[in-house]
């Protein structure tokens, strides 16, 4: 999770540690900035990859992106489960639906492209997001010349739901990469 530390400091907000605190922080942000949507995600090229990052902290699963299975493995019971039919998944959807209905979640979070999402964060229209940690430097480096107080920072995950735990699941992973051979004749190019 990433958050605007400068805005939290300005409003005297603490990092939330559970679902209720998370909700209350969003409400306080909305009260202070009525035209904002305090929580924003980006669509990850039209996928629902946010669910892969969100579901495990609720004690459920969404989709294995490596082979497109909607199953999760429960290490405690030793059984596979179909995440989207679990009570925890329903609880998660109900929570985000509540945020959506109350204007606490960016309305186009499932379709907004990366540029639009960047603009929402940079313009101060949203203050909490879920993305790669490298985005901290991306936002701080690009925003501080015009707003020296702008501070995007890491926010430890809150425990969500009755079965949730404070964790960041291994869902944001690269499945490919680029390499340059040390034997190339154009190594210095």
What is each PLM-predicted segment?
Residues 1-189:
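Extracytoplasmic/secretory soluble proteins
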């Amino acid at each position: 999770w990433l958050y605007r530390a400068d805005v939290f400091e300005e409003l005297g907000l603490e990092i939330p540690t559970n679902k209720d605190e998370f909700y209350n922080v969003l409400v306080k942000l909305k009260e202070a900035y009525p035209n904002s949507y305090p929580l924003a995600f980006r669509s990850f090229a039209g996928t629902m990859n946010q669910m892969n990052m969100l579901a495990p902290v609720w004690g459920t699963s969404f989709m294995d992106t490596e082979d497109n299975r909607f199953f999760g493995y429960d290490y405690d019971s030793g059984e596979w489960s179909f995440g989207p039919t679990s009570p925890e998944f329903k609880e998660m959807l109900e929570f985000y639906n509540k945020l959506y209905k109350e204007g606490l979640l960016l309305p186009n979070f499932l379709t907004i492209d990366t540029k639009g999402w960047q603009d929402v964060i940079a313009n101060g229209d949203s203050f909490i997001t879920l993305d790669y940690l490298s985005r901290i430097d991306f936002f701080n480096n690009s925003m501080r010349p015009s707003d020296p107080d702008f501070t995007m920072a890491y926010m430890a995950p809150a425990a969500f739901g009755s079965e949730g735990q404070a964790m960041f699941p291994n869902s944001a992973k690269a499945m490919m990469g680029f390499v340059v051979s040390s034997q190339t004749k154009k190594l210095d190019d």
